Regions:
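Alpha-helical solenoid repeat scaffolds of the TPR/TPR-like class and their adjacent stem/linker regions
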Residues: 1-172
Length: 174
């Protein structure tokens, strides 16, 4: 009855990035008796959101300043059962790590809602609204169709600061 070691890899666990509003719901509600959740951060950690998310998890590592080989080795040392990529084919992705099989089960979700094109990426989480029946053959991953909707949103906690527009102080429009 060992816990499943699940890690989320992302460059976007920072203040007010949209994926954090979706991931937070998962981190607040996972079954702590069945899962050990970790973050693999590919970004700065000195912000409110990364600190909060780390406190909701059982562990975290940062690979931002590591090259691919050192990142692969550091991740493999953790013996994760499942790693979920939250970036997909975005500018800060680390898909090359997944090409080197950093976990027995590798999946993508949330950050880029399309195929990664990486043969070693086993699964993508989606719903029938996200991936249509006639698009299934375009995915290199096995598609896990979730019932209902493929994501959840934790709500916004942004406090808006009222201030005059810059042109009032500057006396010109930009």
């Amino acid at each position: 009855n060992k816990k499943i070691k699940l890690a989320f890899l992302s460059s976007d666990i920072n203040n007010y990035h949209s994926i954090t509003y979706f991931l937070k719901t998962v981190l607040l509600n996972y079954d702590k008796n069945k899962f050990e959740i970790s973050l693999i951060l590919n970004s700065e950690e000195d912000n409110y959101t990364s600190k909060e998310f780390k406190s909701l998890c059982d562990g975290s590592i940062n690979i931002k300043d590591l090259n691919d080989i050192d990142s692969i080795n550091k991740i493999r040392q953790k013996n994760y059962d499942i790693i979920v990529d939250l970036m997909g084919v975005s500018s800060s992705n680390r898909l090359v790590l997944f090409k080197n099989r950093i976990a027995p089960i590798q999946a993508t979700w949330l950050g880029y809602c399309n195929t990664t094109g990486v043969d070693q990426m086993d699964y993508i989480f989606a719903d029938k609204n996200l991936i249509m029946d006639d698009e299934v053959n375009l995915y290199s991953e096995k598609i896990i169709f979730l019932s209902g909707i493929w994501n959840t949103h934790s709500g916004l906690e942004i406090e808006r600061v009222k201030q005059d527009p810059p042109f009032i102080k500057n006396n010109y429009l930009t």
